[in-house]
From Swiss-Prot:
Residues 207-216 have a biased composition (Basic residues). It comes from the Eukaryota. This is Protein FANTASTIC FOUR 2. Regulates the size of the shoot meristem by modulating the CLV3-WUS feedback loop. Can repress WUS but is under negative control by CLV3. The gene is FAF2. It comes from Arabidopsis thaliana (Mouse-ear cress).
C-alpha cells in the first residue's frame, strides 16, 4: 500500500507580503488603485465629455474675470453688462436696396440692319457708268481682287441658232443683234410672198386637174439652213 501525504499549499505572495513588514499596507493600496485604473480604461468615455471635464467651470470663470484693483471681479461683470447693452442699443445702418436688374433676355427694339448679299460688292462709280467700266474679280494668293476695267464697246450677249442639226450659241453685241433681227424680219417677209404666189398657181391649174407638187425645203427657225457664218465673236457648239 502506498500512502499519499497532502501538504498544504503555501502562497508565495503571502510570504512576500509578510516579509515586507510594515510596507504591506502601501502595497495593498497600490493594488487597489491599479484595479480602479484598469476599470476606468476599459470603460468607454466620449471624447466630448473628456473635453468638457478639462474646461473651466463657472466658478473658475468668475475668478478669471477679475480686473485690476478688485479681487472678486464683481465690478468687471457690471462693466461688461454695460458694454453689452451699449452694443445692442447702437443704431444699425439700414440695408441697401438693390436695384432690380434689367432683363437681358428682352428682344432688341432696334430693327436688324439689312445686308446686301450680292457678290461682288457694288461699287458706286461702276454702277453709274453703263458701258464705260466693268467689274472683274481674280483669285490671287488666296484672296479675291475686284478690279474695274474700262470697256470701249457694249457688253456682248448670247444669240442661239439652229443649223445642220445643231444648236449654236454666239456671243454678239447689241448692235449686231439688232441688225441680225432686222435681216430675219426681211427674210420672213420674202418667204410669205413666195408662199402666196405658189398658192395662186395651184388654184389656177385645178381645173385641168394638174397639180404641181408643192416642194419646199425644210427650214429651221423660219428660214433655210445656211452654212456657218464666219463670226468674229467667239462661238459655242451645243450637241443635242
Amino acid at each position: 500500500m502506498s500512502l499519499v501525504v497532502c501538504q498544504p499549499q503555501i502562497n508565495e505572495s503571502f510570504y512576500q507580503k509578510d516579509d515586507m513588514g510594515g510596507l504591506s499596507f502601501l502595497q495593498s493600496m497600490s493594488d487597489i488603485t491599479s484595479i480602479a485604473q484598469t476599470k476606468e480604461d476599459k470603460a468607454y468615455v466620449h471624447p466630448m465629455e473628456k473635453r468638457s471635464v478639462s474646461k473651466l467651470n463657472e466658478k473658475s470663470l468668475e475668478m478669471c474675470t477679475e480686473s485690476l484693483g478688485t479681487e472678486t471681479g464683481s465690478e468687471s461683470g457690471d462693466e461688461l453688462s454695460l458694454l453689452a447693452f451699449e452694443a445692442t442699443t447702437t443704431p444699425r445702418a439700414p440695408p441697401r436696396q438693390l436695384k432690380p436688374q434689367e432683363d437681358t433676355n428682352l428682344p432688341d427694339k432696334t430693327p436688324p440692319m439689312s445686308r446686301n448679299n450680292s457678290f461682288p460688292p457694288p461699287i458706286k462709280f461702276v454702277e453709274d457708268s453703263k458701258y464705260n467700266r466693268m467689274v472683274r474679280w481674280l483669285g490671287e494668293d488666296g484672296r479675291i481682287v475686284v478690279q474695274a476695267i474700262r470697256v470701249s464697246s457694249p457688253p456682248s450677249c448670247f444669240v442661239s441658232e439652229r443649223g445642220e442639226g445643231r444648236l449654236r450659241l454666239i456671243l454678239t453685241s447689241e448692235s449686231s443683234l439688232l441688225s441680225h433681227n432686222h435681216e430675219e424680219e426681211e427674210e420672213e417677209e420674202t418667204e410669205e410672198g413666195i408662199d402666196e404666189e405658189t398658192s395662186e398657181n395651184l388654184e389656177g391649174k385645178s381645173g385641168n386637174k394638174k397639180f404641181s407638187r408643192f416642194s419646199r425645203r425644210c427650214k429651221e427657225n423660219g428660214r433655210e439652213p445656211k452654212p456657218m457664218l464666219t463670226w468674229k465673236q467667239q462661238q459655242f457648239w451645243v450637241a443635242t
